[in-house]
Amino acid sequence: MLQEDAKVRIQSTDTILKAVAFPAVRFITETSAKINKKKYYSEISFTKEGVHISPEVYMASERRFQVHLPEGAFRDVSDLILSIDYIGDTGAAFINGEMVADNFYHGSSWRIGLKRYAEAIQNDGIYFYLQQLFADATYLQDLPEGLRLDFSKGGVCQLNKIQVIPEYYATFTIGD
């Protein structure tokens, strides 16, 4: 249960941020919030302006690429999630020569929260290296059903899509 004058922060990749307060609250300090009062609780929601961020992707080869974000990309968001849709064995991400994230391919997009690297990414970008996936990989049986990979040319390494997903936030103070 929240105390009066408690500060609350909510985060979401959706532009409509929602929270439920129990017991019901009489007011919150932010005027942009909508409150739907129920008998025992309150539904609180904020609507944020959507942000679209297009990363610049430079391909060095099918296995190596670099991502840069536009100036001010981190403004008005809580975080930016880089979503990398690829097929391969493993992926590694580097900033200034230091590995900051890695991933074993599992059939879903690789997601990396970028906020903690914001300054370095804005200055130098982030570098990615993908390794080929071969037919004898022991974990192929664990990949999602229906995922069919073409090993007729040997290893598979394919970058399908890169997108930036903004994470929004709202901070408010409640009172009973």
Map each language-model feature to its residues.
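Non-catalytic C-terminal accessory domains or segments of carbohydrate-active enzymes
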Residues: M1-D176
